[in-house]
Amino acid sequence: LQQLTKRQSMNSIGKEQVKTKADPYKILLTEDEIPTHWYNILGDMKTQPQPTLDPENNQPVTREYYSKLYSQGCVDQEFSTEKWIEIPDEVRDLYKIWRPTPLVRAKRLEKILGTDCKIYYKNEGVSPSGSHKTNSAIPQVYYAAKDGVKKIITETGAGQWGSAVAFAAQLFGLKCEVFMVRGPYNQKPSRRRLMHLWGAHVTPSPSDQTSVGRKQLAENPDSRGSLGTAISEAIEYASRDAGSKYVIGSIQNFVLLHQTVIGQECITQFGKVDEFPDTIIAPLGGGANFAGIAFPFMESVLNGSKKIKFIASEPATCPKLSEGEFRYDYGDVGKKTPLFPMYTLGHDFMPVPNHSGRPKISWCRIDHLSTYKGWLYHGT
């Protein structure tokens, strides 16, 4: 009788455990379940985006053009239409420092909202730098180190991208120079200190280190700066240093590519609880975060197996997708970048900080990619 009672008790515990597993707060993966490839949505797009143009001749940019700034690995990925691009073993091994990231059920938020909907969020804040930015910083710096580069140059707004690059540069033993928008530079000393701890040199932008910065300071000595100005300074600085390469946190195809580990993990995690979302919502600035979670889900819509609504939430201070004009424009104030086809409020538009659209996201917005219908919600 005691043995029977014990077995019944164990069976009862087992049933409770099964029930708990079916409705968890967090859905976790093992390191072996980290994606082995990045997903390139260009491989599934029937209509390709308009080409990025060289401003000197208004012709499509070439590999040679980008090779002046970026590592060879990133240049290859920028022009690739291959659907799946293998993640290098060394990069995937470094991803294991914090990946896979949890998919969390927001049960208390559901209760407060009084909704029957299941709300999940992907917690990318567990990365060493505190954001999704590290997903691209590590491969970009990896490819630069592979090319024999000794120094990495970049820009940052609030400091998340700069922190991610500083962390990656420290892993590969490279020097790191960060141009940080002056407003956040003064307002967020903790981010600045974090970059310093990882060995980066941080310069407030606009600065006296570049012609773009000097011009801005001459016009307004008290300028708080903008991300567009910081990009210009970083590109100018990198262009004159033969031993360095520039890395960027949004804009380019290869950045969006690297971020797709987010959505791929989500798909695997939902499979663990036999769920699949009908709506994907993500904040949208330069497009990397939105693309990271949305693009892998768009694959199933493009092949006709699923129907999903994609919602982008953009800042009301820079409503580029909802109020911007679709045209070719620079991605920075100083006109150092190529010309991108995108929804833009103008490269010289000056909110705090400066924003511009991501070309591939913009192409989705004009409905050439029917999975993205352009539901746009303004954040504060």
Give the positions of each predicted feature.
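Glycine/charged-rich beta-loop-alpha catalytic/anionic-binding loops adjacent to active sites
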Residues: 116-127, 146-152, 244-251, 273-278, ...
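A short, small-residue-rich loop immediately preceding and capping a beta-strand
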Residues: 136, 144-183, 276-289, 310
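General beta-strand structural signal in soluble alpha/beta enzymes
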Residues: 99, 119-123, 153-154, 203-205, ...
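Positively charged, low-complexity intrinsically disordered leader regions
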Residues: 14-149
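Long hydrophobic segments that form regular secondary structure
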Residues: 254-255, 259-299, 303, 371
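A glycine-rich, Thr/Ser-enriched phosphate-binding loop motif common to dinucleotide/cofactor-binding enzymes
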Residues: 128-139, 250-265
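Active-site/ligand-binding loops adjacent to catalytic centers
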Residues: 84-86, 216-254, 274, 299-302, ...
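Active-site-proximal loop->helix
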Residues: 161-224, 320-333
